[in-house]
Amino acid sequence: MSENVMTLQVITPAGVVYDHHANYITARTTNGEIGILPNMISTIAGLEIDELKVRRPDDETHVDYIAVNGGIIEIKDSLVTIVADSAERNRDIDVSRAERAKIRAEKALEVAKAEKKSDEIKRVEVALHRALNRLNVSSHN
Amino acid sequence: MGASLNEIKTKIASTKKTSQITGAMQMVSAAKLQKAESHAKAFQTYAEKVRKITTDLVSSDNEPAKNPMMIKREVKKTGYLVITSDRGLVGGYNSNILKSVISNIRKRHTNESEYTILALGGTGADFFKARNVKVSYVLRGLSDQPTFEEVRAIVTEAVEEYQAEEFDELYVCYNHHVNSLVSEARMEKMLPISFDEKGDEKASLVTFELEPDRETILNQLLPQYAESMIYGSIVDAKTAEHAAGMTAMRTATDNAHSVINDLTIQYNRARQASITQEITEIVAGASAL
């Protein structure tokens, strides 16, 4: 293994979603976007619902996108671990399902706003955010 | 000889049908067990990682914990999350866990106000209701391969009740799946979260850069940790349930077969007896002439 490579593992309750080498990763933490390079200082941070961009070492143009629903990122000894409730690679995303989830969330948001339930609004907004994120990531195909 | 030929015949036919059904149910449970086992395995990796990150984070400095989920409060009330099945036909699965919960509760508490039950699965909920034990939360109709989303409702409920100081510690009671023949009733303390038991693991010497800060990450990570622990026990319990169902149905099928054997012998004897009787009657009739 060359020195300038790190391993990225994305793990969800349904199993390991992604386990590959990478030489550059961008992720959005609660504090903002970070770029991760091999041999970086050990870090733990919370993630936003957003996309993860992974540059693979085999080819300059080889980039993977992963939709991550929150979770935690841990960087330690060039091993990047992400544990999240759910995560999907762009090629695994079911676009029509994500589309339906988006429409459902939009409708639920209208209802919740009409009824002025602030908890419900927050919850639905997160669901909508997730659906939009999945759609956004799947568009990289 | 009691029963007539016809009666025995119907009995044999009906037992055969029952054995077919139990045989089919055994196969269904076996298939579900296999699925549940692979699911539990996939989840194991997740649980390990969450645990590792939490340990890394907590052991990276020695300040006393400030997070409400880690602070030990004086125990005034204990919550028990009891995982049972919704359906019957799983052998001793339910009675096993309920018996151990009841005996534990009797040992620990003298007063009813000292504990509360959260029931997952209909059998447990009905059991405690019939005994006038207060059940503060019931979740029924969990699917055979519960997803994380499905279980989140009860986990969130448990964590919220804990944070609202409805109870001061939470135990999860479930059947741990050992193998397809053996499961054992377990009672595990989930809240407050403690890392005392991992004394043999060496604390990592790596210091971590924390973004944004320790408390914020803990606030996000600890609920996830608790969720994963509780979800893990639910997955484990479901696996044990399928195993118990499989074993129970196999025993039922075996029993049905032995009943059919006995009945067939009885039937043949009765048939033989009636033939003998007929011959005797004919012979007696002939000699009377």
Swiss-Prot record, chain A:
Q: Which SUPFAM superfamilies match?
A: Epsilon subunit of F1F0-ATP synthase N-terminal domain (SSF51344)
Note the superkingdom of the native organism.
Bacteria
GO (cellular component) term, any one: plasma membrane
Query: From the Swiss-Prot or TrEMBL record, what is one GO molecular function term?
Result: proton-transporting ATP synthase activity, rotational mechanism
Compartments annotated for it: namely: Cell membrane
CDD domains, alphabetically? Answer: F1-ATPase_delta (cd12152)
Q: How does it sit in the membrane?
A: Peripheral membrane protein
- What are the transmembrane regions? none
Q: How does it assemble?
A: F-type ATPases have 2 components, CF(1) - the catalytic core - and CF(0) - the membrane proton channel. CF(1) has five subunits: alpha(3), beta(3), gamma(1), delta(1), epsilon(1). CF(0) has three main subunits: a, b and c.
What task does this protein carry out? Produces ATP from ADP in the presence of a proton gradient across the membrane.
NCBIfam families, per database record = ATP_synt_epsi, PRK00571.1-3
The family annotation for this protein states:
Belongs to the ATPase epsilon chain family.
Name of this protein: ATP synthase epsilon chain
Q: Which organism is it from?
A: Lactococcus lactis subsp. cremoris (strain SK11)
Q: Give the lineage.
A: Bacteria, Bacillati, Bacillota, Bacilli, Lactobacillales
UniProtKB/Swiss-Prot annotation, chain B:
| Cited function | Produces ATP from ADP in the presence of a proton gradient across the membrane. The gamma chain is believed to be important in regulating ATPase activity and the flow of protons through the CF(0) complex.
> Which organism encodes this protein?
Lactococcus lactis subsp. cremoris (strain SK11)
A molecular function (GO) held by this record is: proton-transporting ATP synthase activity, rotational mechanism
Protein keywords: ATP synthesis, Cell membrane, CF(1), Hydrogen ion transport, Ion transport, Membrane, Transport
Please name the PROSITE patterns in this protein's record: ATPASE_GAMMA
Annotated GO biological processes are: proton motive force-driven plasma membrane ATP synthesis
What topology in the membrane does the UniProt record assign? Peripheral membrane protein
Q: What is this protein called?
A: ATP synthase gamma chain
Summarize the subunit comment. Answer: F-type ATPases have 2 components, CF(1) - the catalytic core - and CF(0) - the membrane proton channel. CF(1) has five subunits: alpha(3), beta(3), gamma(1), delta(1), epsilon(1). CF(0) has three main subunits: a, b and c.
What is any Pfam family matched here? ATP-synt
Family indicated by similarity: Belongs to the ATPase gamma chain family.
Compartments it resides in: Cell membrane
